[in-house]
Amino acid sequence: MGGTTDFVLSITIVLVILIIIAFIWYNFTGWSPFKYSKGNTVTFKTPDESSIAYMRFKNCVFTFTDPKGSLHSVDVTNVLNNMAKGFRDAQNPPSSFTLGGHCQAPLNAFSFILPGVNDRATVATADEAKKWENCDATLTGLQRII
């Protein structure tokens, strides 16, 4: 009975070590930073033409100023990850995607919506939207292919 217990304990220890190694590998290796500023077209592309569905994002923050000069930030990590994962079931998934889709809209204060700040209810008219033309916007974070 002692031999069986020792074997099970050994296997359990090996599995725990492998899980720890996998956790360290995923969280601390292979991430490359990106930064886009106002006016840039935001395009994420895989380096080896693999499917964009395998791209993952971490610590992605969209920061922008409003016409009054107030600074706003929103974590958009889940948004970007879900955009990439959305290509999983495509028959011919692309190797890149552009924020804004086919419009290829440059990064601006409306690239991501923060309710109560830059949503349609708050900025309801074209005249109000024009006030936002000179507002800064940045998108920063980490990306990797899994």
UniProtKB/Swiss-Prot annotation:
Its keywords, alphabetically, are: Host membrane, Membrane, Transmembrane, Transmembrane helix, Virion
Main localization (coarse): host cell
Question: Where found in the cell?
Answer: Host membrane; Virion
Tell me where the transmembrane regions lie: 7-27
Q: Which GO terms describe its cellular component?
A: host cell membrane; membrane; virion component
Q: How does it sit in the membrane?
A: Single-pass membrane protein
Instruction: Kindly summarize what the UniProt induction comment says about this protein's expression.
Output: Expressed in the late phase of the viral replicative cycle.
Q: What family does the database annotate?
A: Belongs to the asfivirus E146L family.
Q: What is this protein called?
A: Uncharacterized protein E146L
Q: What is the lineage of its organism?
A: Viruses, Varidnaviria, Bamfordvirae, Nucleocytoviricota, Pokkesviricetes
